[in-house]
């Protein structure tokens, strides 16, 4: 089956952190060598006693963070991190700061940057600040709302209180344009419908990014994915971490040429369970809706059973009233690939 190019999804409006194309006024390319700077800041009422070198090793998971991006991108993206060790003290107590609004978050970074007058923050792609109490939050805005800095604007930066490399990966992926897949903001319908299958949904359980996010970032080569609009197709679906073969199938829901919503089929990745990697290999089916903003359920997994047991196995059939196709899983091979039949409705 010849691979067809997947269209850019139509957001049908100005959607913040969409599953469609990244906003070029905020986000840079997700290909190539990226420079990040890691800072350490605390407060008079939240004094950090841990050595910043130890803190840096912990939050990066002794290399887990860098390895994750290198492997998930198939070597197309590397992140070099420069540390500025030593805790710098902010002028007010922790309760006087917040990352909950754009204005308060921006002002927090303005003060943090002032603590480092000799550093040129414009030289870095990503700015990461370790600090207690403020939580884990990524800032990303167009110039009119961006962080003012020496007559310029900085569009993206993050602060992190967690010491999990997967939480840092989640926040870093926000700096790259990905939305939250967990639910907030009073959204009707299922809560956290992407389950443990992507870092943007569950940084504590997921081991990587869904195929769609690898596609969005430009990491998944053209011959590793295909776009099906009609007919019945039998094909071998290879795991995303394989070196060859079709690993992602996309089927449009609403428009063949310029869809805003698609269904995606791929082989599931391992998930984490109590510090162990739990294999749950099978066929994963989910929808992607570019009209929905961060936190509004832009990705929905359609599970075989529950979200922890989402992958379909040999002999299973996926058929749903909302889906533009049906799927039969015919066989699972020793290399983790699956033979499937896709019939577009």
Give each language-model segment a name.
Residues 2-169, 186, 254, 272, ...:
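Zn2+-dependent metallopeptidase catalytic core
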Residues 121, 126-274:
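Extracellular hydrolytic enzyme modules, especially secreted metalloproteases
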Residues 3-17, 49-50, 83, 141-162, ...:
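Non-catalytic C-terminal accessory/binding modules of secreted extracellular proteins
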Residues 42, 203-204, 289:
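Residues at the C-termini of beta-strands that transition into short coil/loop
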Residues 53-58, 214-220, 300-304:
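Short intrinsically disordered coil segments
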């Amino acid at each position: 089956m010849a691979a067809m190019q997947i269209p850019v999804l139509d957001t049908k409006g100005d959607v913040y952190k969409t599953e469609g194309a990244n906003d070029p006024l905020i986000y840079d390319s997700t290909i190539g060598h990226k420079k990040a700077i890691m800072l350490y800041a605390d407060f008079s009422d939240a004094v950090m006693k841990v050595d910043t070198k130890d803190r840096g090793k912990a939050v990066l998971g002794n290399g887990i963070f860098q390895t994750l991006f290198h492997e998930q991108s198939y070597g197309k993206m590397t992140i070099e991190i420069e540390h500025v060790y030593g805790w710098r003290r902010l002028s007010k107590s922790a309760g006087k700061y917040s990352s909950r609004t754009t204005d308060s978050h921006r002002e927090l970074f303005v003060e943090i940057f002032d603590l480092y007058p000799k550093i040129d923050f414009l030289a870095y792609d990503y700015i990461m600040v370790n600090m207690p109490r403020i939580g884990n939050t990524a800032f990303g805005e167009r110039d009119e709302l961006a962080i003012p800095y020496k007559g310029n604007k900085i569009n993206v930066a993050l602060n992190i209180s967690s010491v999990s490399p997967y939480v840092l990966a989640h926040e870093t992926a926000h700096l790259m344009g990905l939305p939250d897949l967990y639910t907030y903001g009073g959204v009707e319908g299922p809560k956290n419908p992407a389950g443990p299958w992507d870092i943007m949904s569950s940084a504590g359980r997921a081991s990587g990014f869904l195929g769609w996010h690898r596609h969005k970032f430009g990491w998944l080569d053209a011959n590793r994915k295909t776009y099906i609009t009609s007919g019945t197709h039998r094909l071998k679906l290879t795991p995303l971490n394989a070196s060859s073969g079709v690993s992602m199938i996309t089927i449009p829901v609403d428009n063949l040429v310029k869809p805003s919503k698609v269904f995606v089929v791929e082989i599931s990745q391992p998930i984490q369970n109590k510090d162990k990697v739990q294999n749950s290999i099978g066929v994963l089916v989910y929808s992607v809706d570019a009209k929905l903003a961060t936190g509004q359920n832009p990705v929905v997994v359609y599970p075989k059973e529950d979200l922890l047991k989402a992958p379909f196995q040999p002999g299973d059939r996926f058929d749903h009233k909302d889906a533009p196709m049906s799927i039969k899983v015919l066989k699972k091979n020793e290399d983790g690939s699956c033979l499937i039949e896709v019939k577009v409705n």
